[in-house]
């Protein structure tokens, strides 16, 4: 009943129909179980990478050189920015400028 009243307005009807058409098109592709072999391999690799990343808790297949380089770069950043926490946004404090009042000589 409420939907019928809403669909009387052409603007709402057209917006909803476009939205539904777009979503139905996306879900039809997403739920298509018939994947070609290349696409299936790609999706399998993405899932494998995701599971590896979750188990390792960081970068996948990163050797000790990568960890050393990462620590070195983070150390450089901490030195450049005064040992600030890199995960938080810096707090800025702006002071209002102080203006001097200059009196105009009267002519």
UniProtKB/Swiss-Prot annotation:
- Residues with N6-succinyllysine modification: 93, 98
Q: Main site of residence? A: mitochondrion
Asked if Ligase is a keyword of the record, the answer is no
Which InterPro entries is this protein grouped with? ATP_synth_f6_mt, ATP_synth_f6_sf_mt
For the biological process aspect of GO, one term held by this record is: proton motive force-driven ATP synthesis
Which keywords label this protein? Acetylation, CF(0), Hydrogen ion transport, Ion transport, Membrane, Mitochondrion, Mitochondrion inner membrane, Transit peptide, Transport
* Pfam hit, one: ATP-synt_F6
GO cellular component entries: mitochondrial inner membrane; proton-transporting ATP synthase complex
Task: List, alphabetically, the SUPFAM superfamilies matched.
Answer: Mitochondrial ATP synthase coupling factor 6 (SSF111357)
Molecular function (GO) terms listed? proton transmembrane transporter activity
Which residue windows are transmembrane per the record?
A: none
| PTM sites of type N6-acetyllysine | 40, 45, 78, 93, 98, 104
Where does the transit peptide lie?
A: 1-31
Query: Has UniProt tagged this entry with the keyword Acetylation?
Result: yes
Subcellular location field: Mitochondrion; Mitochondrion inner membrane
Family of this protein: Belongs to the eukaryotic ATPase subunit F6 family.
Q: Which PANTHER family match?
A: ATP SYNTHASE COUPLING FACTOR 6, MITOCHONDRIAL, ATP SYNTHASE-COUPLING FACTOR 6, MITOCHONDRIAL
Q: How does it assemble?
A: Component of the ATP synthase complex composed at least of ATP5F1A/subunit alpha, ATP5F1B/subunit beta, ATP5MC1/subunit c (homooctomer), MT-ATP6/subunit a, MT-ATP8/subunit 8, ATP5ME/subunit e, ATP5MF/subunit f, ATP5MG/subunit g, ATP5MK/subunit k, ATP5MJ/subunit j, ATP5F1C/subunit gamma, ATP5F1D/subunit delta, ATP5F1E/subunit epsilon, ATP5PF/subunit F6, ATP5PB/subunit b, ATP5PD/subunit d, ATP5PO/subunit OSCP.
Per its database record, what is this protein's job? Subunit F6, of the mitochondrial membrane ATP synthase complex (F(1)F(0) ATP synthase or Complex V) that produces ATP from ADP in the presence of a proton gradient across the membrane which is generated by electron transport complexes of the respiratory chain. ATP synthase complex consist of a soluble F(1) head domain - the catalytic core - and a membrane F(1) domain - the membrane proton channel. These two domains are linked by a central stalk rotating inside the F(1) region and a stationary peripheral stalk.
Q: What is this protein called?
A: ATP synthase peripheral stalk subunit F6, mitochondrial
């Amino acid at each position: 009943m409420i939907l019928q009243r809403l669909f009387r307005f052409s603007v709402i009807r057209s917006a909803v129909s476009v939205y539904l058409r777009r979503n139905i098109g996306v879900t039809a592709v997403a739920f298509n179980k018939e994947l070609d072999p290349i696409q299936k391999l790609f999706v399998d690799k993405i899932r494998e990478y995701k599971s590896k990343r979750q188990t390792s808790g960081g970068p996948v297949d990163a050797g000790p050189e990568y960890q050393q380089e990462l620590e070195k770069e983070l150390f450089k950043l901490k030195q450049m920015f005064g040992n600030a926490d890199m995960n938080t946004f810096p707090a800025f404090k702006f002071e209002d400028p102080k203006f001097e009042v200059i009196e105009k000589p009267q002519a």
